[in-house]
Swiss-Prot record:
This is Tripartite terminase subunit 2. It is found in: Host nucleus. GO terms for cellular component: host cell nucleus. Residues 11-27 have a biased composition (Acidic residues). It comes from the Viruses. Residues 1-69 are annotated as: Disordered. Component of the molecular motor that translocates viral genomic DNA in empty capsid during DNA packaging. Forms a tripartite terminase complex together with TRM1 and TRM3 in the host cytoplasm. Once the complex reaches the host nucleus, it interacts with the capsid portal vertex. This portal forms a ring in which genomic DNA is translocated into the capsid. Associates with TRM1 and TRM3 to form the tripartite terminase complex. It comes from Human cytomegalovirus (strain Merlin). Belongs to the herpesviridae TRM2 protein family.
Length: 157
């Protein structure tokens, strides 16, 4: 299977400039250049294989990481999508992904609550699931009411 070169562009700053592939701020604890995944690459010493950008003493990187060769056939390339201020607030990749994911869920919830998702195909599914959950809770409460009613003696007997 042949994969074409793909770049995943994301917004970095509000200035509209495209970010370079080389890290601008050397003092930043998080590298800002893209992660390159190449399944056909030979594993370098000290790496698990397939990932370029890690490794020993390469001449390209100032921080001990090799810069990716952009002339190769790349499968996937990640670029930062958050402003640089989040480098300090969210130091790990997991923290950044969780931040973005929580923001997307919150935005989707607000659209659903305020009715802006009339054209959204997921809106009908959410309404059906809400109705189903309401019906299940109602049945459970009815069962509890029936069981509580059987414990009490009937008023006519």
């Amino acid at each position: 299977m042949s994969w074409a070169k793909q770049r995943v562009p994301f917004l970095d700053d509000d200035d509209g400039e495209e970010e370079n592939d080389v890290q601008d701020d050397v003092d930043s604890p998080v590298p800002t250049r893209p992660l390159v995944i190449d399944e056909d690459a030979e594993p370098a010493a000290g790496t698990s294989g397939g990932l370029e950008g890690g490794g020993g003493d390469d001449e390209d990187g100032e921080d001990g990481h090799a810069l990716p060769d952009l002339d190769d056939d790349l499968l996937l390339q990640f670029e930062p999508m958050l402003p640089r201020v989040y480098d300090l607030l969210l130091p790990s990749l997991d923290a950044r992904l969780n931040f973005v994911n929580a923001g997307q869920k919150y935005a989707a919830f607000l659209k659903y609550v305020h009715g802006d998702c009339a054209t959204c195909s997921h809106g009908e599914i959410l309404r059906e699931k809400t109705q189903l959950l309401t019906a299940i809770v109602s049945k459970l409460m009815d069962i509890n009411g029936i069981l509580e009613g059987k414990d009490e003696p009937a008023p006519g007997k």
